[in-house]
């Protein structure tokens, strides 16, 4: 039995304004019981404009839900219009920040070098990066999905020391399964997540590899989460659309009951 605490993180993407965010987090908090938090860490990744409202709610009501951002600047401050720095997120008491999400790589042309700089920026400010990796459909169909994903893992962790790497979360998200309704089979997801863990052992140590949490992301729902979570190298889920439905996200967090 793994000692890794499962992490269910809801990536809201560009959805929910700050008022909707408050109502949504309140609904999650009301539905989740102490036993749920003992079995699983629950986090939300709202848009930047919601973070202060979520922080105020979590602090004021002493909620056990964690929160974080969907991206971070590689820079700490300066003339970078539209960017948000790690120090700003740290001041909002964010725990997590997603880095290298496929939509950032695809629409904002983020390379492994940029993702690596953002991983380092996260660590500089005491944030835990959720490093997102995964392949497009043509890469999988060519049989290169493992190699492609491990290249992203290695690129994202370049020059990251072990004492930082041991706290990172890695999210395997096959791009072709995100928001499409297509689900990567649990065995296929396990294949890549096991390869990621083996790569961590190669880059650092087996001990470190056994510590790192590896999530699966890609059309996760309450109906498939139990099968995914039964796999030995999958330690949680990065949930997109389903996290916008509070009842559904609570069911996902209660994967052990599904």
Swiss-Prot record:
Chief place of localization = cytoplasm
Q: What is this protein called?
A: Triosephosphate isomerase
Query: Pfam families of this UniProt entry?
Result: TIM (PF00121)
Q: How does it assemble?
A: Homodimer.
Chain ranges passing through the membrane: none
- Swiss-Prot/TrEMBL keywords: Cytoplasm, Gluconeogenesis, Glycolysis, Isomerase
Give the GO terms filed under biological process for this record: gluconeogenesis; glyceraldehyde-3-phosphate biosynthetic process; glycerol catabolic process; glycolytic process
Q: Where in the cell is it found?
A: Cytoplasm
Report the pathway entry.
Answer: Carbohydrate biosynthesis; gluconeogenesis; Carbohydrate degradation; glycolysis; D-glyceraldehyde 3-phosphate from glycerone phosphate: step 1/1
User: Where's the active site on this chain?
Assistant: 101 (electrophile), 173 (proton acceptor)
């Amino acid at each position: 039995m793994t000692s890794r605490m499962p992490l269910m993180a809801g990536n809201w993407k560009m959805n929910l304004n700050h008022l909707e965010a408050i109502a949504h987090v309140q609904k999650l908090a009301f539905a989740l019981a102490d036993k749920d938090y003992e079995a699983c860490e629950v986090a939300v990744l709202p848009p930047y404009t919601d973070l202060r409202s979520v922080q105020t709610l979590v602090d004021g009501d002493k909620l056990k839900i964690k929160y974080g951002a969907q991206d971070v600047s590689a820079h700490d401050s300066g003339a970078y219009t539209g960017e948000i720095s790690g120090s700003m997120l740290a001041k909002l008491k964010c725990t997590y920040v997603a880095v290298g999400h496929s939509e950032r790589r695809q629409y904002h042309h983020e390379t492994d070098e940029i993702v690596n700089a953002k991983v380092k920026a996260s660590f500089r400010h005491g944030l835990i990066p959720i490093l997102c990796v995964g392949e497009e459909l043509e890469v999988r169909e060519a049989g290169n999905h493992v190699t492609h994903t491990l290249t992203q893992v290695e690129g994202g962790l370049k020059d990251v020391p072990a004492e930082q790497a041991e706290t990172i979360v890695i999210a395997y998200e096959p791009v072709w399964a995100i928001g499409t309704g297509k689900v990567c089979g649990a065995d296929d997801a396990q294949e890549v997540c096991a390869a990621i863990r083996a790569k961590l052992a190669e880059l650092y140590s087996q001990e470190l590899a056994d510590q790192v949490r590896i999530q699966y992301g890609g059309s996760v729902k309450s109906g498939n989460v139990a099968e995914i979570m039964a796999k030995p190298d999958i330690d949680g889920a990065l949930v997109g659309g389903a996290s916008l439905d509070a009842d559904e996200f609570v069911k996902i967090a209660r994967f052990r009951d599904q």
